[in-house]
Protein backbone atom coordinates (compact mmCIF):
# COMPACT_ATOMS: atom_id res chain seq x y z
CA UNK A 1 0.00 0.00 0.00
CA UNK A 2 2.79 2.42 0.94
CA UNK A 3 4.52 1.99 -2.42
CA UNK A 4 1.24 2.50 -4.31
CA UNK A 5 0.45 5.63 -2.29
CA UNK A 6 3.92 7.02 -3.02
CA UNK A 7 3.39 6.36 -6.72
CA UNK A 8 -0.06 8.00 -6.66
CA UNK A 9 1.15 11.00 -4.68
CA UNK A 10 4.33 11.81 -6.57
CA UNK A 11 3.65 10.50 -10.07
CA UNK A 12 2.60 12.34 -13.20
CA UNK A 13 -0.86 11.49 -14.53
CA UNK A 14 -1.31 10.62 -18.20
CA UNK A 15 -4.98 10.22 -19.17
CA UNK A 16 -5.40 7.43 -21.72
CA UNK A 17 -9.17 6.88 -21.79
CA UNK A 18 -12.56 7.29 -20.20
CA UNK A 19 -14.99 4.81 -18.67
CA UNK A 20 -18.06 5.79 -20.67
CA UNK A 21 -20.62 3.83 -18.61
CA UNK A 22 -19.84 5.78 -15.42
CA UNK A 23 -22.34 8.40 -14.26
CA UNK A 24 -19.55 10.84 -13.29
CA UNK A 25 -16.36 11.69 -15.17
CA UNK A 26 -14.17 8.62 -14.68
CA UNK A 27 -10.85 8.73 -16.49
CA UNK A 28 -8.41 5.87 -16.99
CA UNK A 29 -4.72 6.59 -17.11
CA UNK A 30 -1.17 5.90 -16.14
CA UNK A 31 0.69 7.35 -13.19
CA UNK A 32 4.35 7.68 -14.14
CA UNK A 33 6.88 7.77 -11.29
CA UNK A 34 10.58 6.93 -11.08
CA UNK A 35 10.66 5.07 -14.39
CA UNK A 36 7.58 2.93 -13.87
CA UNK A 37 3.89 3.32 -14.60
CA UNK A 38 0.82 2.31 -12.60
CA UNK A 39 -2.69 2.09 -14.06
CA UNK A 40 -5.11 4.41 -12.29
CA UNK A 41 -8.64 5.78 -12.23
CA UNK A 42 -8.98 9.55 -11.88
CA UNK A 43 -12.33 11.11 -10.95
CA UNK A 44 -12.11 14.91 -10.99
CA UNK A 45 -14.49 16.79 -8.70
CA UNK A 46 -15.37 19.02 -11.67
CA UNK A 47 -16.86 15.94 -13.37
CA UNK A 48 -19.20 15.00 -10.52
CA UNK A 49 -22.92 15.13 -11.33
CA UNK A 50 -24.99 16.81 -8.62
CA UNK A 51 -27.06 14.47 -6.46
CA UNK A 52 -30.17 15.55 -4.59
CA UNK A 53 -29.13 13.81 -1.37
CA UNK A 54 -25.37 14.46 -1.22
CA UNK A 55 -23.61 17.84 -1.08
CA UNK A 56 -22.05 18.90 -4.39
CA UNK A 57 -18.35 18.29 -4.83
CA UNK A 58 -17.95 15.71 -2.04
CA UNK A 59 -17.85 12.38 -3.87
CA UNK A 60 -14.05 12.33 -4.25
CA UNK A 61 -13.66 13.05 -0.54
CA UNK A 62 -15.95 10.12 0.25
CA UNK A 63 -13.94 7.82 -2.03
CA UNK A 64 -10.78 8.82 -0.17
CA UNK A 65 -12.47 8.41 3.22
CA UNK A 66 -13.56 4.88 2.27
CA UNK A 67 -9.95 4.00 1.46
CA UNK A 68 -8.67 5.49 4.72
CA UNK A 69 -11.28 3.61 6.74
CA UNK A 70 -10.62 0.34 4.91
CA UNK A 71 -6.86 0.71 5.31
CA UNK A 72 -6.82 1.83 8.95
CA UNK A 73 -9.29 -0.79 10.15
CA UNK A 74 -7.69 -3.70 8.29
CA UNK A 75 -10.60 -4.39 5.94
CA UNK A 76 -8.16 -4.00 3.00
CA UNK A 77 -11.00 -3.76 0.50
CA UNK A 78 -10.45 -0.40 -1.20
CA UNK A 79 -7.48 0.02 -3.55
CA UNK A 80 -4.96 2.72 -2.59
CA UNK A 81 -6.67 6.07 -3.14
CA UNK A 82 -5.62 9.70 -2.73
CA UNK A 83 -6.92 13.20 -3.38
CA UNK A 84 -4.72 15.27 -5.66
CA UNK A 85 -4.57 17.71 -8.53
CA UNK A 86 -4.87 16.22 -11.99
CA UNK A 87 -5.41 17.43 -15.56
CA UNK A 88 -9.04 18.38 -14.79
CA UNK A 89 -8.41 19.74 -11.30
CA UNK A 90 -8.63 18.25 -7.83
CA UNK A 91 -10.00 14.74 -7.73
CA UNK A 92 -9.69 11.20 -6.52
CA UNK A 93 -6.95 8.98 -7.94
CA UNK A 94 -7.08 5.25 -7.27
CA UNK A 95 -4.88 2.33 -8.26
CA UNK A 96 -6.54 0.31 -11.02
CA UNK A 97 -7.23 -3.33 -10.15
CA UNK A 98 -6.92 -5.95 -12.87
CA UNK A 99 -9.85 -8.30 -12.33
CA UNK A 100 -9.30 -12.04 -12.63
CA UNK A 101 -11.13 -12.83 -15.87
CA UNK A 102 -11.36 -16.51 -14.84
CA UNK A 103 -13.74 -15.67 -11.99
CA UNK A 104 -17.38 -16.34 -12.88
CA UNK A 105 -18.93 -13.39 -11.07
CA UNK A 106 -22.44 -14.79 -10.67
CA UNK A 107 -21.11 -17.96 -9.05
CA UNK A 108 -18.46 -16.18 -6.97
CA UNK A 109 -20.90 -13.70 -5.49
CA UNK A 110 -23.62 -16.27 -4.78
CA UNK A 111 -21.34 -18.20 -2.39
CA UNK A 112 -21.02 -17.68 1.34
CA UNK A 113 -17.48 -16.29 1.40
CA UNK A 114 -15.66 -14.60 4.28
CA UNK A 115 -14.56 -11.70 2.07
CA UNK A 116 -18.16 -11.03 1.02
CA UNK A 117 -19.31 -11.02 4.64
CA UNK A 118 -16.46 -8.60 5.40
CA UNK A 119 -17.54 -6.37 2.51
CA UNK A 120 -21.17 -6.45 3.66
CA UNK A 121 -20.05 -5.30 7.12
CA UNK A 122 -17.82 -2.62 5.57
CA UNK A 123 -20.74 -1.34 3.47
CA UNK A 124 -23.01 -1.20 6.52
CA UNK A 125 -20.43 0.77 8.52
CA UNK A 126 -19.71 3.31 5.76
CA UNK A 127 -23.42 3.53 4.88
CA UNK A 128 -22.84 2.61 1.23
CA UNK A 129 -25.78 3.66 -0.94
CA UNK A 130 -24.55 2.13 -4.19
CA UNK A 131 -23.03 -1.37 -3.98
CA UNK A 132 -23.32 -3.26 -7.26
CA UNK A 133 -21.67 -6.42 -8.53
CA UNK A 134 -19.63 -4.37 -11.01
CA UNK A 135 -17.97 -2.56 -8.10
CA UNK A 136 -16.38 -5.78 -6.82
CA UNK A 137 -12.96 -6.60 -8.14
CA UNK A 138 -11.56 -10.08 -7.41
CA UNK A 139 -7.92 -9.88 -8.46
CA UNK A 140 -5.64 -12.58 -9.84
CA UNK A 141 -4.16 -13.24 -6.39
CA UNK A 142 -7.57 -14.15 -4.95
CA UNK A 143 -7.98 -10.84 -3.11
CA UNK A 144 -11.31 -9.03 -3.27
CA UNK A 145 -11.22 -5.27 -3.78
CA UNK A 146 -14.19 -2.92 -4.06
CA UNK A 147 -14.48 0.41 -5.84
CA UNK A 148 -16.90 3.30 -6.32
CA UNK A 149 -17.43 4.69 -2.82
CA UNK A 150 -18.53 8.22 -3.70
CA UNK A 151 -21.97 7.86 -2.16
CA UNK A 152 -21.03 6.72 1.34
CA UNK A 153 -20.77 8.24 4.83
CA UNK A 154 -24.13 10.03 4.63
CA UNK A 155 -25.49 11.41 7.90
CA UNK A 156 -28.82 9.62 7.30
CA UNK A 157 -29.26 5.84 7.05
CA UNK A 158 -29.09 5.15 3.32
CA UNK A 159 -27.64 1.65 3.01
CA UNK A 160 -28.87 0.39 -0.37
CA UNK A 161 -27.58 -2.39 -2.50
CA UNK A 162 -28.55 -4.65 -5.35
CA UNK A 163 -25.77 -7.10 -4.56
CA UNK A 164 -26.51 -8.93 -1.34
CA UNK A 165 -29.02 -11.41 -2.76
CA UNK A 166 -27.61 -14.35 -0.85
What are the residue ranges of the model-derived segments?
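Conserved ATP-binding subdomain of kinase catalytic cores across diverse folds
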Residues: 3-108, 112-129, 133-134, 140-147, ...
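C-lobe/activation-segment region of protein kinase-like
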Residues: 144-166
Amino acid sequence: VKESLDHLTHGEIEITGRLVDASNATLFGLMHHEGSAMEVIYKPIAGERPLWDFPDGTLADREYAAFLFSDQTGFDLVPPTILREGPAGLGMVQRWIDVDEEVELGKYFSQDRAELRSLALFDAIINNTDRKIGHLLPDQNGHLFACDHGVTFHSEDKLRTVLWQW
